[in-house]
A protein has these predicted regions:
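Extracellular adhesion/carbohydrate-binding repeat motifs centered on closely spaced tryptophans
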Residues: 1-461
Length: 461
């Protein structure tokens, strides 16, 4: 006759109900203890008192099993059970997974972390690891089947397995995780880093990696780097130390972290330009596909030419420069009249304005404001020194380092000296050719030849 959960009662040896519990008797009428007995398709465990064990974790040798409220051993099943080792870093309850033979998964004898593929109720297969006691591991996990806890767990952890009710190994995916880092002095750091876990579940460390078309840099502890990072331009014997001029890479904001390629605007890091960093002033940069930024050169981008200093900051405004084959050898921003180069100086003048886009090198005629005064400039439109201010007589004007030479306002006519000769120009700076007895505001008469050179000057015609 059957009783309880699939238990068949026999008159002699076998299962017997004693009025309060099930026991299993041998032929000598001795109740068995600390062993498994089967009834039908289920296994049951008899404890040290000979009674059937119910709703309890059973430790049998080196293995763990669980019997339900009917005493039957469970199989292919998750169970959340009280944790005998609960504490500050341990939960009050832990998860076990009992295989088809009822035995709980646990760490292998080698102690090395081993993941088991388990089909969830949803039909999705995930990978889980367990410690030597059969507890499902979660959070940061090392390679010795142990959880890593504490403020710097992110440094020592190799795998990440979700929270205490998840446990699934993160693989081929990003996770933004809590990470206390006393060494990060960035004011925008919010005690979290992004990490990427390979398909084997291990976090990427100390490497550059392209993921979904974006390039990332990972620190030695696996954190995705962001903002300014100095990266050597080569490895091994060919390695060149990272410096502001050769290896500044920018890896975006903390919520993006990928390598900035093309245009981006940001505050330079202290290793790039300390003054700009302290001033919290943003500049445009142009990121290169393999890291670093364009530095110390003219570069044509989408049909427009721009200038970049030795730290990669886009130039904007009027500059005197020494340039060779588009490489900027020296530069100084001109912010007032006293900084303008003289006729015999070796520097040439360039202007990076606001149209058609900010920072575009100007060519041809344009107006430049300096010290509150507007001047006309003309910059070369072609040649190896395209963009440099023209010198000498050009288009009926006299230019010095690109600046049109003009006379005092209201004078009508005036004299400009160039290469030892005197030329007559009008109020707008245009050379006056073949003029006879034209009079300026001071009642002085002038006559000029076909080149505009003065042939007569006096109070009379």
């Amino acid at each position: 006759m059957a009783f309880g959960f699939g238990i068949t009662s026999y008159a002699a040896a076998g299962w017997q109900w004693d009025g309060s519990d099930w026991r299993y008797f041998q032929r000598d009428n001795e109740a068995v203890t600390n062993t498994w007995k089967k009834s039908g398709s289920h296994w049951f465990y008899l404890g040290s008192d000979g009674c059937m064990v119910r709703s309890r974790l059973v430790e049998d040798g080196d293995d763990y099993y669980y019997v339900n409220s009917s005493g039957a051993r469970v199989a292919n099943e998750w169970r959340k059970l009280p944790n005998s080792e609960s504490g500050s870093d341990e939960p009050d309850e832990v998860w076990y997974y009992f295989q088809s033979n009822g035995r709980a998964y646990k760490a292998p004898d080698s102690g090395r972390t081993s993941f088991k593929s388990i089909v969830k109720a949803s039909g999705e297969t995930k990978k889980y690891a367990f410690d030597s006691n059969g507890h499902m591991l979660f959070g940061w996990v090392n390679e010795e089947s142990e959880r890593v806890t504490g403020d710097e767990a992110w440094k020592e952890g190799v795998y990440y397995c979700g929270d205490e009710d998840d446990g699934a190994m993160v693989q081929g995916a990003w996770r933004q995780l809590e990470a206390m880092d006393s060494g990060n002095e960035d004011s925008s750091f919010n005690d979290e880093y992004w990490f990427y876990f390979n398909t084997n579940g291990k976090k990427i460390t100390g490497a550059k990696k392209t993921i979904n078309g974006h390039k990332y840099l990972f620190g030695e502890d696996g954190e995705a780097k962001y903002k300014w990072q100095s990266v050597p331009v080569a490895t091994g014997s060919a390695a060149v130390p990272a410096t502001p001029s050769n290896a500044n890479s920018y890896y975006k904001r903390p919520d993006q972290c990928w390598l900035a390629v093309g245009w981006f605007k940001t505050v330079p890091g202290p290793e790039v330009d300390m003054q700009a960093y302290e001033d919290d002033e943003e500049y445009w940069f142009y990121g290169l596909p393999n890291g670093g930024v364009v530095t110390s050169q003219f570069k044509t981008i989408n049909g427009h030419t721009y200038g970049f200093n030795e730290n990669g900051m886009m130039l904007h405004g009027l500059y005197k420069m020494k340039v060779e084959n588009k490489k900027i050898l020296s530069y100084e921003k001109i912010e007032n009249e006293s900084q303008l180069p003289q006729a015999g100086d070796s520097e040439k003048v360039y202007y990076f304005g606001d149209t058609p886009k900010e920072g575009v090198m100007k060519t041809g005629r344009c107006s430049v404001d300096l010290d509150g005064e507007r001047s006309t400039y003309y910059f070369k439109t072609s040649g190896t020194d395209r963009g440099a201010g023209v010198e000498g007589i050009y288009d009926d004007g006299i230019y010095e380092k690109g600046r049109l030479q003009t006379i005092e306002y209201g004078m009508r006519y005036g004299v400009i000296k160039y290469q030892g000769k005197e030329y007559l120009v009008n109020q707008s700076g245009k050379i006056q050719k073949n003029k006879k007895n034209v009079k300026d505001a001071d009642e002085v008469y002038y006559s000029t030849d076909k080149d505009g050179i003065i042939t007569h000057r006096g109070n009379k015609e």
